[in-house]
Design a protein with these regions (language model features):
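Patatin-like phospholipase
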Residues: 1-47, 55-389
Length: 389
């Protein structure tokens, strides 16, 4: 018993934070959830924006980190005027070989306390890349000279060619994502027993071998679009921070669902899948946590508001063949698949009407239809099951 307790005490948990520019706010939401879950972080590693967040995690102050992210906007990160247009940004890249990051350096000097990072007791590492010799630099605190932490974080986050390379002692560095955008390997090398990897699907090289080798890893990755990496916007920052929080709680089984967050045990496994699809297709708020009554009320409200489209519903309910479904999918702006949210809802309603009318004989119950439009079929089945249409 004593040996088991000692083993548990010595267990090391690593938080690995991927690169992805403005998407990094998602990682702060994950960290908030981990703190609420009481999961102690012993090691932290990051690339690019993940390196910035890793330094903040090492300092241990979530409120301070939130303050940093409130200040991160496109013009406070890059050397751009507040009223700059996208064409101005392109001009910066062409003329100056990337946008300057002077404002970001100033913010990091303000928020990153190197002394606290070094005294945190956490194993800490970041990744940078030097194009001159194609050098991949996996840097621990011992590798970073005193007083140079912010500089090496800047080096890790210099996403060339969008951003200018960052020079330290005559050596030019560019974004660590060129070496490893999600440095799980560093955590493994340093003896992590459990790895929590936060994947922003950012630009860079994913070392698949390390991802496959990691035996005890919680891989947290959003199914949502987290936004364009080089546009920092306060509203999107708050949105994806909440998504990170919810996705972490889902990863640890506190919440359920993929697109929508449900309180645990609200639906059985099969119904949960259908409800998740229904919530996504009907476009309900995915930043809330739903109990069954609240979810049903919201779904009902959406359907009621959409009933003005009855004529289109009647037409969709009349789809008689897979050929007609494909023609609908290929029509106009939908030729690459269903991307128009309103059209997606309409097809869902039409499918529900057809399933309600024809049961197992419905074209939407066929094996091919469930492969072609699985999300819509599941959503439609949910509406029929709960007699919502």
């Amino acid at each position: 018993m004593e040996l088991k307790e000692r083993s548990m005490k010595n267990k090391k948990t690593a938080l690995v934070l991927g690169g992805g520019g403005s998407r990094g706010a998602y990682e702060i939401g994950v960290w908030q959830a981990l703190k609420e879950l009481g999961i102690k972080i012993d090691m932290v590693y990051g690339t690019s924006v993940g390196a910035i967040n890793a330094a903040m995690v090492a300092q241990g102050n979530l409120d301070l980190t939130a303050e940093l992210w409130k200040e991160l906007e496109t013009d406070t990160v890059f050397d751009m005027a507040p009223d700059s247009k996208p064409t101005d940004y392109v001009k910066e890249i062409v003329v100056n070989q990337g946008a300057g990051t002077g404002p970001l350096h100033g913010l990091l000097e303000k928020y990153v306390d190197e002394k606290k990072v070094r005294e945190s007791g956490l194993d800490f590492g970041i990744v940078a890349f030097s194009p001159a010799d194609l050098g991949k630099h996996f840097l621990r605190l011992a590798d970073i000279p005193e007083g140079k932490l912010v500089d090496f974080i800047m080096a890790s986050a210099s996403a060339f060619p969008a951003l200018q390379a960052y020079e330290i002692n005559g050596v030019s560095y560019i974004d660590g994502g060129y070496a490893d955008v999600l440095p799980v390997g560093m955590a493994m090398e340093d003896g992590a027993d459990e790895i929590i990897a936060v994947d922003l699907a950012g630009f860079g090289n994913v070392v698949k071998e390390n991802m496959e080798k990691a035996e005890n890893m919680v891989h947290i990755k959003s199914s949502e679009n987290l936004g364009f990496e080089f546009i920092f916007d306060k509203q999107n920052t708050l949105r994806i921070m909440k998504l990170g929080y919810l996705d972490c709680l889902k990863a640890y089984g506190v919440l359920e669902g993929k697109e929508i967050a449900f309180a645990k045990g609200v639906f059985d496994k099969n119904t949960l899948k259908m409800a998740d699809c229904a919530g996504d297709v009907l476009g309900i708020d995915n930043l809330l946590i739903y109990t069954e009554p609240v979810f049903m009320d919201r779904i009902t409200e959406v359907i009621y508001d959409d009933m003005e489209s009855q004529e289109k519903l009647a037409k969709l309910a009349g789809l008689k063949s897979l050929k007609e479904i494909r023609e609908f999918l290929d029509n106009g702006k939908l030729k690459e698949g269903i991307k128009d949210a309103k059209a997606e809802k309409l097809l869902c309603y039409g499918a529900a009407e057809d399933i309600k009318k024809n049961g197992k004989r419905s074209i939407f119950q066929s094996r091919t239809a469930t492969k072609l439009i699985p999300k819509i079929v599941n959503a439609a089945k949910f509406l029929v099951k709960y007699e919502l249409i």
